[in-house]
């Protein structure tokens, strides 16, 4: 991943403090829902986990279209089965590891646009439902300003996702 400007020493100090603060409340697991293209850094998360003993669960998935890598996926949609590619990526990151490591995602993160689920976002939701059916993992979502939560749930469950393993965010 390209993470220009990543200040590892400073961020390590900040994260160690955040973990200490969380641990003071009895928290022993943190979910980092940063998506693949939004700066997810699994090696850094593992470093913090190893230093502190905190369980840190990272995600696989993509953010909403306006702030994501969707230009690439929209281009690929013209000549490839991107639902299959996205599904395979998610299952690989959940079962084998991320970016050539043995660090596995523990959740799928999805997002939709304000007042709509775009056609490409819909493909991600369908791929995620398939990946959840295969792996049993939780799907967490992001809604823009609280819109589209029920529609996200309907789309996921219509494609076979287990509603007891779906968390809709920001409603």
Region spans (language model):
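Alpha-helical scaffold segments that flank or form the walls of functional sites
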Residues: 2-34, 38-55, 83-103
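Active-site core of metal-dependent hydrolases
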Residues: 134-171
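Active-site gating/metal-coordination segments in enzymes
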Residues: 47-50, 55-57, 61-138
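Glycine-rich phosphate-binding "P-loop"
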Residues: 2-11, 110-116, 139-144
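Acidic-and-aromatic substrate-binding clefts and catalytic sites of carbohydrate-active enzymes
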Residues: 35-41, 117, 147, 170-171
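Distinct, well-ordered alpha-helical segments
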Residues: 44-45, 71, 118-124, 146-160
């Amino acid at each position: 991943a390209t993470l220009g400007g990543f200040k590892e020493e400073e961020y390590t100090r900040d994260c160690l403090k955040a973990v200490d603060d969380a641990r003071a409340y009895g928290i022993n697991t943190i979910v980092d829902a940063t998506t693949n293209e939004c700066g997810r850094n699994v090696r850094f998360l593992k470093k913090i986990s190893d230093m502190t003993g905190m369980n840190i669960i990272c995600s696989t998935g993509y953010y909403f279209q306006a702030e994501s890598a969707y230009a690439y996926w929209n281009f690929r949609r013209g000549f490839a089965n991107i639902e299959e590619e996205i599904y395979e990526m998610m299952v690989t990151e959940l079962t084998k590891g991320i970016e050539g490591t043995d660090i596995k995602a523990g959740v799928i993160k999805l997002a939709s646009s304000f007042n709509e689920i775009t056609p490409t976002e819909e493909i991600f939701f369908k791929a995620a439902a398939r990946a959840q059916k295969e792996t049993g993992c939780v799907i967490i979502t992001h809604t823009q300003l609280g819109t589209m939560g029920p529609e996200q749930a309907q789309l996921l469950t219509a494609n076979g996702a287990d509603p007891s393993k779906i968390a809709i965010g920001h409603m």
